[in-house]
C-alpha cells in the first residue's frame, strides 16, 4: 500500500500549455506534469529561480489525472474550448526575432468547465513527505491557479489522503468515478500510452523533455 494525496482541479477556465511556436498558445486536454509541478511549487512557496528546490520537487512526486464529468443542477456540463486574441508590445527578445515589428499577436486556448481529480504519490527518491505537501495545499504560500494566472480555482485543491495499491484504486475513493485516467505509472503494464513533452528541464527555462502517460479509459484497463 502507498500513501496518496488527492487534489481537485476545477474552475471556469483552465490552460495547460503544450509545445508552441510564435503566437499560438494551445492547451492540453488535461493538466500536464509541468503544470502540476508549478501548482505544487506555488503552494510550497518555491521561487522560480530556486532550481535546487524545483528539482527536488520534480524528483519527489508522480501524478495520475482523472478527467471528471461536471454536473450542475442535475445537468451534465460539457467541456468546451475557448480561444482569445492578444497583442503584446515589448515581448521577450527571442520573440521579436520572429516578427517584423515590435507588436506580436498571440492566440491563447483554454478549457471551459473542466474538472479533474489528481492522485499524487512519492517516488523512491522523494525528499519530502505527503503531510508536507498536504499542509502546503491547505495553506498555499502563493496563489495557485489552473495553468495561467487568469484561471482561478472554484473548488479547494485538497480532497483528501488515502492508502491504495495503485493510483487507479486511489482515485476510485473519490467521486465522480469513471472518467479517463492519465497516469505516470502503468498499473498492469497493458495500458495504451503516448509521449508528451511536459517534463520541465529545471536548469533550462522553458525547455521540456519527453515522457510517457499511460491511459486508463473510463477508469478501466485498456490493453495495447
UniProtKB/Swiss-Prot annotation:
Keyword Transport annotated: no
Coiled coil: none
Keyword terms of this UniProt record: Antiviral defense
GO biological process: CRISPR-cas system; defense response to virus; maintenance of CRISPR repeat elements
Induction of the gene: Repressed by H-NS, activated by LeuO. Activated by the BaeSR two-component regulatory system, possibly due to envelope stress. Part of the casABCDE-ygbT-ygbF operon.
Phenotype upon gene inactivation: Loss of resistance to bacteriophage lambda infection, loss of plasmid silencing. Decreased levels of crRNA.
One Gene Ontology cellular component: protein-containing complex
GO molecular function, one term: DNA/RNA hybrid binding
UniProt key word Kinase: no
Role of this protein: CRISPR (clustered regularly interspaced short palindromic repeat), is an adaptive immune system that provides protection against mobile genetic elements (viruses, transposable elements and conjugative plasmids). CRISPR clusters contain sequences complementary to antecedent mobile elements and target invading nucleic acids. CRISPR clusters are transcribed and processed into CRISPR RNA (crRNA).
Oligomer and partners: Part of the Cascade ribonucleoprotein complex, with stoichiometry CasA(1),CasB(2),CasC(6),CasD(1),CasE(1)-crRNA(1). Interacts directly with CasA and CasC. Stable subcomplexes of CasBCDE-crRNA and CasCDE-crRNA also form, both of which are able to bind target dsDNA, and at least CasCDE is able to form R-loops. CasCDE and CasCE complexes have endonuclease activity. Binding of target ssRNA or dsDNA causes a conformational change in the Cascade complex.
Record protein name field: CRISPR system Cascade subunit CasD
Protein species of origin: Escherichia coli (strain K12)
Taxonomic lineage from the root: Bacteria, Pseudomonadati, Pseudomonadota, Gammaproteobacteria, Enterobacterales
Amino acid at each position: 500500500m502507498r500513501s496518496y494525496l488527492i487534489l481537485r482541479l476545477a474552475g471556469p477556465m483552465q490552460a495547460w500549455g503544450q509545445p508552441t511556436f510564435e503566437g499560438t498558445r494551445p492547451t492540453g486536454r488535461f493538466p500536464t506534469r509541468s503544470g502540476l509541478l508549478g501548482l505544487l511549487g506555488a503552494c510550497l512557496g518555491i521561487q522560480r529561480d530556486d532550481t535546487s528546490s524545483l528539482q527536488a520537487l520534480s524528483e519527489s512526486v508522480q501524478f495520475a489525472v482523472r478527467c471528471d464529468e461536471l454536473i450542475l443542477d442535475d445537468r451534465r456540463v460539457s467541456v468546451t474550448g475557448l480561444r482569445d486574441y492578444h497583442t503584446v508590445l515589448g515581448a521577450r527578445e527571442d520573440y521579436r526575432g520572429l516578427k517584423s515589428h515590435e507588436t506580436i499577436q498571440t492566440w491563447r486556448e483554454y478549457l471551459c468547465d473542466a474538472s479533474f481529480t489528481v492522485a499524487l504519490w512519492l517516488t523512491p527518491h522523494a525528499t519530502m513527505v505527503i503531510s508536507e505537501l498536504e499542509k502546503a495545499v491547505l495553506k498555499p504560500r502563493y496563489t495557485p491557479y489552473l495553468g495561467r494566472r487568469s484561471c482561478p480555482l472554484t473548488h479547494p485543491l485538497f480532497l483528501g489522503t488515502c492508502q491504495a495499491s495503485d493510483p487507479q484504486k486511489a482515485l476510485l475513493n473519490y467521486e465522480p468515478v469513471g472518467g479517463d485516467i492519465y497516469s505516470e505509472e502503468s498499473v498492469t503494464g497493458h495500458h495504451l500510452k503516448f509521449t508528451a513533452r511536459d517534463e520541465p528541464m529545471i536548469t533550462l527555462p522553458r525547455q521540456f523533455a519527453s515522457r510517457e502517460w499511460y491511459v486508463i479509459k473510463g477508469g478501466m484497463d485498456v490493453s495495447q
